[in-house]
Amino acid sequence: MVFADARVNDLEALMPGMIDFIVSRGVNNYNGDPYPKLYIVNEQKVCTGAYGKPMDICDIAGYYNDDTNEIFIRDKPTKNMTEDRFQEVVLVHELVHFLQYHDGTWQKVTCKQELESHAYEVQDAYVDLYGIDPQQKIDPLFGLLSSMCPRANPMLFHQHLHGGD
């Protein structure tokens, strides 16, 4: 657990610069809200927290809990990511969601999936800026599909059969 604590401290030290980087992209604002508490946890805890029900496996690298102002990041990369600054890349993505929640963007979107689009753009720009392994960038097709609103695209999300969001 000592490694995780040291890693959390290292990542927390990066938060102010990451917030500045995100804000400099011209979409989000930082209003001085307390930074989120950061946790590095195993895959099961990330999956269960992200889906709100017990799950052992998923392909989610981390998530921001707006109720508790906490970010949870996996201790190991997902199958589509590499070790190269993995947790740092996930943190910058989740900090976009932190800002979206606190600057009101969260309430302005048609569906929560739309929030992913800007987080992916920031993540990719961060990877490029710091020369991080390009595999840490979002696959363009995945990015497109995961940021679409299910209700607006029923044929893609089988809502014509199942209904609801």
Annotated model-derived regions:
Residues 89-102:
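Active-site recognition of the HExxH zinc-binding catalytic motif
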Residues 53-54, 104-110, 142:
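Flexible, surface-exposed loop/gating regions in the mature catalytic domains
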Residues 1-6, 69-75, 103:
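Acidic/histidine-rich, surface-exposed loop or edge segments in extracytoplasmic proteins
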Residues 6-71, 130:
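Auxiliary, metal-adjacent structural segments of Zn-dependent hydrolase domains
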Residues 143-165:
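Short, low-complexity, Pro/Ser/Thr/Gly-rich segments in the mature regions of secreted, periplasmic
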Residues 110-145:
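Post-HExxH zinc-binding segment in Zn-dependent metallohydrolases
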Residues 82, 99, 108-109:
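Mature extracytoplasmic domains of secretory-pathway proteins
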Residues 73-91:
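Short pre-active-site segment immediately N-terminal to the catalytic Zn-binding motif
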